């Protein structure tokens, strides 16, 4: 691939997952000549940070922020691909480093706006889910009693029913072995300052809707799109929440298309 056509992708995972969940996408994009980095956020994947060390959203996003900070002015802008709750770390990264990001791709991801608090789009959905809907997912709190932080660990039944229901069983089994306890992005973690129009608001955003997502339902994905319209909306109609497993080839085709148009 000619240098001008070679793009740099940075992949950001969602809640309880890690860089490992991008293995199919990374392999495919690198095979066609692109540069791909999949990031483990703090206390995720093989990152050794302990949950108790994560007191702020910046703490959780530290590996992503360090990666972007390491890029020089001569480096190409990155295409930031964020999945699920990874949309909020991606928004923070673009708020801090808008000049280093060509576009953010929100893959059935929580897409914050610049009016409400960073955690708003996540908490709005979570409040609508009845407790029994979480099945065997474990929730808890940590940190200071007067300002508690929250964590979650997806249970295998919840993953099978709501995240991986259309994905290969091998990938579900992989996830059962590799998911970790992660902080939930609440106001106590993310703070009370909205993302800025001058930072996050200037970065091109693309949203990929997953039509069979049982965790972030399609109607909620469209609500976020209406709430803070992106540059373009694409769809993978038969993808579950884990589109990188259930529809990897379609997802990669869309990412290559986005790279050609916006990077």
Swiss-Prot record:
Its EC number is 3.1.1.-. It catalyses: methyl salicylate + H2O = salicylate + methanol + H(+). The keyword Chloroplast does not apply. Pathway: Plant hormone biosynthesis. GO terms for biological process: salicylic acid metabolic process. Esterase activity is down-regulated by salicylic acid (SA). One of its GO terms (cellular component) is vacuole. Gene3D superfamilies: alpha/beta hydrolase (3.40.50.1820). The keyword Hydrolase applies. Belongs to the AB hydrolase superfamily. Methylesterase family. This is Methylesterase 4. It comes from Arabidopsis thaliana (Mouse-ear cress). The gene is MES4.
């Amino acid at each position: 691939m000619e240098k001008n056509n070679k793009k740099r992708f940075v992949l950001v995972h969602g809640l309880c997952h890690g860089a490992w969940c991008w293995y199919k996408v990374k392999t495919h994009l690198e095979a066609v000549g692109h540069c791909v980095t999949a990031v483990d956020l703090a206390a995720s994947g093989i990152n050794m940070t302990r949950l108790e060390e994560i007191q702020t959203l910046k703490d959780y996003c530290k590996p992503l922020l360090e990666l972007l900070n390491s890029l020089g002015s001569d480096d190409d802008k990155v295409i930031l691909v964020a999945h699920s709750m990874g949309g909020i770390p991606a928004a923070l990264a673009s708020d801090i480093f808008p000049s280093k990001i060509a576009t953010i791709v929100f893959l059935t991801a929580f897409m914050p706006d610049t009016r409400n608090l960073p955690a708003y789009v996540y908490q709005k959905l979570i409040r609508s889910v009845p407790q029994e809907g979480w099945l065997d997912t474990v929730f808890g709190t940590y940190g200071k009693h007067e300002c508690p932080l929250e964590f979650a660990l997806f249970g295998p039944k919840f993953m099978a029913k709501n995240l991986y229901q259309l994905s290969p069983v091998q990938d579900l089994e992989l996830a059962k072995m590799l998911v970790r306890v992660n902080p939930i992005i609440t106001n106590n973690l993310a703070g009370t300052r909205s993302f800025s129009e001058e930072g996050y608001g200037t970065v091109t955003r693309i949203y990929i809707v997953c039509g069979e997502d049982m965790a972030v339902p399609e109607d909620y994905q469209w609500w976020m799109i209406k709430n803070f319209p992106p540059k373009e909306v694409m769809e993978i109609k038969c993808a579950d929440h884990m589109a990188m497993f259930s529809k990897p080839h379609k997802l990669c085709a869309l990412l290559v298309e986005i790279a050609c148009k916006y990077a």
